[in-house]
Amino acid sequence: MATIDESLALIGRGAEEILKLEQLEARLTSGVPLRVKAGFDPTAPDLHLGHTVLLNKMRQFQELGHQVIFLIGDFTGMIGDPSGKNVTRKPLSREDVLANARTYEEQVFKILDRTRTEVRFNSEWFGQMSAADMIKLSAQHTVARMLERDDFAKRFAGQQPIAIHEFLYPLVQGYDSVALKADVELGGTDQTFNLLMGRGLQEHYGQAPQVVLTMPLLEGLDGVAKMSKSLGNYIGINEPAIDIVTKTMKIGDTLTWRWIDLLSFDISVAEAARFKEDVAAGNLHPRDVKLRLARELATRFHDAATAEQAIAGWHAVVTGQGDTSVLPLQQVSVPAEGLRIASLLTAAGLTPSNSEATRKLKERAVKIDGEVVDDLARQFGPGFEGVIQVGKRNFARVALVTS
């Protein structure tokens, strides 16, 4: 059994902020298993690695003997979380929310322990709440308090509309903690206002206020913007293992350490520190660290054998040796007369523009099935299939079809 100090170290790994740390320590000291809550609005059907930052932290609480509550915001999902938004988010239909919620339940147990997980829906209590009850709840905070939120303040100052239902969202999320009697609530750094709302409402309803633990927002594949499906810089946890491996191997070396801190169970803090020292000293290649992480992620969301097969496929491309047929086949539509190589690279998503493709070709940084291609006039038409590689990290197995 972990000591209090060991528990605090594991809980604090990668965390941005814990409010209040002394309250968390006191609750851990009591020896009573904590009720740890995190809410997810089912606004899209699939989860990605950015979502797993919170799920991973929930799993760590489970490993310490605590009960976690995976709260599906089927009610709040129909409101639309305004956090960080400059415009009003379009609410989802009940049918969309429920369809997405079903896929969430299937995916989360790739990480969470079923025996220590409650799956709850906040329509359980809000579906029974009367209009009078909702008005009483809304009376707990003022418009002035709501305008303390950065996103609301910016929209108000910029004379952008703020719908009344958006003001209700933090209150509704906060009341979830009351309904669930949460001891701890987890959320991203963009959720701090909403999480603190839960503390205040719990005190109002005579409960001990929950501890708030915020986690950083995971940067996506570009290493800059928050991981997001809309930006295309994400890895979905339901993606094929080969995609998980190849995408992970493309991330920048600096981002690797961030991902290890927030996504890895297998690489301890001490081991990550040793890896950093070895890389800095030239005794370890950053690629090998990245491969360790890629193997862990592919195994977690698939299995060890599938992960090894995916790694073999990735290795076959980067070395020019081995079987590349395990790589996913991407169909690219081209006109009957075909495309020149620069246009093909752009159409396949391997370069952002034809000018960048031309630059890569002149640098002899483009290979097709392991052979360097630098003929700018070379044409490819329907029926072509092969592995195209741009630089060391960017590649795809493509098949050209008539558009």
Curated annotation (Swiss-Prot):
Location of the S4 RNA-binding domain: 339-400
GO-annotated molecular function: ATP binding; RNA binding; tyrosine-tRNA ligase activity
Subunit structure: Homodimer.
Protein species of origin: Xanthomonas campestris pv. campestris (strain ATCC 33913 / DSM 3586 / NCPPB 528 / LMG 568 / P 25)
EC class name: ligase
Entry-linked Gene3D superfamilies: HUPs, RNA-binding S4 domain, Tyrosyl-Transfer RNA Synthetase
Motif ('KMSKS' region): 226-230
GO cellular component: cytosol
GO biological process: tRNA aminoacylation; tyrosyl-tRNA aminoacylation
Keyword hit for Ligase: yes
Binding residue positions for ATP: K229
Catalytic activity: tRNA(Tyr) + L-tyrosine + ATP = L-tyrosyl-tRNA(Tyr) + AMP + diphosphate + H(+)
CDD domains given in the database record: S4 (cd00165), TyrRS_core (cd00805)
Protein name: Tyrosine--tRNA ligase
InterPro entries found in the cross-reference section: aa-tRNA-synth_I_CS, aa-tRNA-synth_Ic, Rossmann-like_a/b/a_fold, S4_RNA-bd, S4_RNA-bd_sf, Tyr-tRNA-ligase, Tyr-tRNA-ligase_bac-type, Tyr-tRNA-ligase_bac_2
Enzyme nomenclature, EC number: 6.1.1.1
Keyword Cytoplasm: yes
